[in-house]
Amino acid sequence: MGSPNDLHYIKTVCPTVTGSVLEVGARENSTGFRGYFAPTATEYIGTDLVPGSDVDVVCDLTAPENPLPKNHFDLVICCSVMEHVPNPWVMAEKIAEVVKPGGKLYICVPWAWRYHAYPDDYYRYSFKAIEYLFPDFAWDRYAYSSEMDGDIRWINKNEIGRDNKWVHVACDDQGKPIKKYIPYLLINLIGTKNA
């Protein structure tokens, strides 16, 4: 699952991975993470609640037992998944367990989005919410994105928490605002697990 901008974002902030990669929520992912990272990664594992063509391990990352190896993955990708989890704090803990110290975690979650059950739809997130759920990570490279291909707005960390009413503004050819809008809006950020 996810948007076309997920792959644009990850190519910018993490162009190559030579270690192990875990993709959480891989069943219906059309973003192409596997095709992009598998040629250079030593290992690529897709996980989901149910079987699918890109699912290597079927598991529930909110269950008491986590079948994935701890402190193992160089990169964990979790896009458009956490809004479907009734207890995201448990999932966040399980995801953090499998990222090796110094490893990366790429999270993309909706901030403004329509209801979409898979199997249900519980939450919307801000950057601060993700930082709170994953306290063992140093977060970097914040961005807003929409479902429109290439529509990514990079923001500085010091802009977090300020009024973001101008986060997406359509501009004319000279860069002057012509329309303020909030389309479906995702937040994207990558963090490095503290040693």
Language-model region placement:
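Short, surface-exposed alpha-helical recognition segments that flank or form part
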Residues: 1, 83, 179
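Class I SAM-dependent methyltransferase Rossmann-like catalytic core
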Residues: 1-15
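N-terminal capping/interface segment
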Residues: 8-10, 75-77, 184-186
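Short secondary-structure boundary/capping segments within folded domains
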Residues: 11-15, 36, 179
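Conserved long hydrophobic alpha-helices within structured protein cores
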Residues: 13-27, 140-143
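A short, aliphatic-rich alpha-helical micro-motif
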Residues: 14-15, 70, 134
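Conserved SAM-binding loop
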Residues: 19-116, 191
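S-adenosyl-L-methionine-dependent methyltransferase catalytic module, highlighting the catalytic core
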Residues: 86-96, 100, 104-195
